[in-house]
Amino acid sequence: MELICDNISFAYNKDVQVFQNFSHTFKPGITVLKGYSGSGKTTLLKLLAGYLKVTSGRIITPTGHRVTSRRYHQQGVAYMFQGINLLPLMSVERNLHLAAEMAMLPRKEWKPRCEALLRDLGLVELRHRRADKLSGGQAQRAALARTLMKAAPTILLDEPTSGLDDGNTDIIKKLVTQDAAKRICIISTHDSRLLELADDLIDFDHPVSC
């Protein structure tokens, strides 16, 4: 199982070249994209998620689906956006169920998967609380739970511990490590606390081209 960037290039316009002839093979485990804000980490995640299109080269997905296809978005990849991406008027539990529904996860799998994530992320007592009533750390954990509800082979996490204290960060680190052995997990971060998780590290503090 591999997610492959094959000689990809991307530019927002003729004056802003972000990637040029970049190649990398992502394998099961955790790849950390390290670097300062604006270095291209989030752009790469959006390319891998199919939200942006490469200007040249190709991305080969583990499922064989085109990176821009609806099936890939539904079942091939799960993306945790930078910032909280929860529906604010829905409960934590309903946010998780909606993620499962959108990913076409069999309904019989919803409850056990939801219960495990609520337990592992310390959200059991918050399951019926509206997302807009959560603290920052609680909302970040709920957003991760929503992402992991998808049984996708590729998980993309954009700054998952941004602004979190050590306690909340440790909870997220533990679950990501536990989940990553079976999936390709790519984390964009400038948080040094996450570097120890890396099976593979791409340093965006230096030019990303080859």
Segments (PLM) and residue ranges:
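Hydrophobic anchor residue at the start of the ABC signature
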Residues: L144
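Catalytic Walker B motif of ABC-type/P-loop ATPase nucleotide-binding domains
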Residues: I155-E159
